Amino acid sequence: MSDIAVTISVLSLVAVLGLWIGHWKIRGVGLGIGGVLFGGIIISHFANQYGLKLDEHTLHFVQEFGLILFVYTIGIQVGPGFFSSLRESGLKLNVLGGLIVVLGALLVVIIHQVTEIPLDAILGIYSGAVTNTPSLGAGQQILNELGMQDITETMGMSYAMAYPFGICGILLTMWLIRLFFKINIDKEAENFDRETGKDKETIRKANIRITNANFAGLNLRDIPGFEKNGIVCTRLKREQDIFIPQADTQLQVGDILHFLGDPKILHEMELILGESIQVEASAMKGNLRTERVVVTNEKILSKKIRTLAFHQQYGVMISRLNRSGVELIPTANTTLQFGDVLHIIGSADVMDKVIEMFGNAQSKLNQVQMLPVFIGIGLGVLLGSIPFSIPGIPVPLKLGLAGGPLVVALILARVGTIGKLYWFMPPSANLALREIGIVLFLSVVGFKSGGNFVHTLINGNGLEWMFYGIFITFVPLLITGIIARIYAKLNYLSICGLVAGSMTDPPALAFANSLKENCGASALAYATVYPLVMFLRIISPQLLAILLWRAV
């Protein structure tokens, strides 16, 4: 067999063993994908004993390409929610998530300054302690740019030493906070449901009858506040006639308007127009038909709703738009993206033509457009290769293969569509590419780390590294958890989601969800902080490397 064939075969064995180890669970908690790292360490230990050498060039390519795939697909996954998570609605949770990252980084600086732990080792400990593999890749990239050599083995070993307690430490923090504050899970779930009850309906329906005679003869657009984003009138009932009103439709006393939109604006409409009444849904249907349509027609991507003119041509209206799980009230200036789910209302006679205009090809949602994938990867690698100088740093720095693809993926996922190119990726395809990437990366890192792993653990600094990893895992989580409970007044289940999300750890989220399966508090908090924290976890080791390199 050729060297390349031997290398690929051994890495495949590493992946099989590692994934098998990752499926082992103790009380529902396992290593997950991190098992691949330990599979690599085990195989490498025996390969070293028998003198088996793998092709270095192949190992290097597999490691870097796996990292690129993983980081890029992470960016595509979290991109749509990354920028929205920075908005005010999730400000409190994101500040607390950022605090966990900052506290961990400060501990790294302190430990490095008061001990003799090498820079590559402390960055590996940091990545393992926070159970974040992209952080490990980013740290390796920046140290290479700074001129450090032969760092993969040390970083991989220190990462592996800290990783196991990184997982256990999250669960231990949840348990200690629960014990310290004497938490009643059922009561916390009830409190969450009660507190969020008012906010569950971001879009509400209302039937309002016009009793204010001042609006008789005025156009629909003349209603104060009607032009505000966040409200739409989808039907007008006048005696026995039901139709979709235009902006210039003249109003009459007794008209019943069916609105969708922001509850606050709807309340204003009630005060201005007349009274809110209960009307059976069938009574407001008439000859109108409602359909749920998916945008898949490449000809209308990136176009504004007003330019399609379907409202004027067919009398059809879009009442709601769902994009990446977020429900919106569209305006005439809303730009359509691939995968947008539209709720449209119109005459049954023309509905089929309108559906054809939007595409509604459900099968396309399961297809991956490969051209945008490689365009994004190429642009990411290009961006990561552009050097920039920072005063005091001896060499120009780069975002590298971890930072470049991540930044580009975040931007492209947020943009969504450029011409006929769209960066929508089916969740199953994204997960497959992401898992392949991380398995490739961890297989090589584990194999390169395994030769001296046992010796380092028994005779070297392994136990010391493990202790510092426990410190970096536990202290930031516990401090932030207490602050979140006492000062931020967060629900305990939300704190569990915050803790899991700040460590970007799905097994921890699964554990948090199992505390109260019918309550979505943990999942909501996890999803809120995940995009920003993932970005900070990848950027933080690079900033730490620059800071500590300057201090050397």
Swiss-Prot record:
Keywords: Cell membrane, Membrane, Repeat, Transmembrane, Transmembrane helix, Transport. Residues 190-275, 277-360 form the RCK C-terminal domain. InterPro entries: AAE_transporter, RCK_C, RCK_C_sf, Transpt_YidE_put, YidE_YbjL. It comes from the Bacteria. The keyword Repeat applies. Disulfide bonds: none annotated. GO terms for biological process: potassium ion transport. Its main location: membrane. It is a multi-pass membrane protein. One of its GO terms (cellular component) is plasma membrane. GO terms for molecular function: monoatomic cation transmembrane transporter activity. It is found in: Cell membrane. Belongs to the AAE transporter (TC 2.A.81) family. YidE subfamily. This is Putative transport protein Asuc_0023.
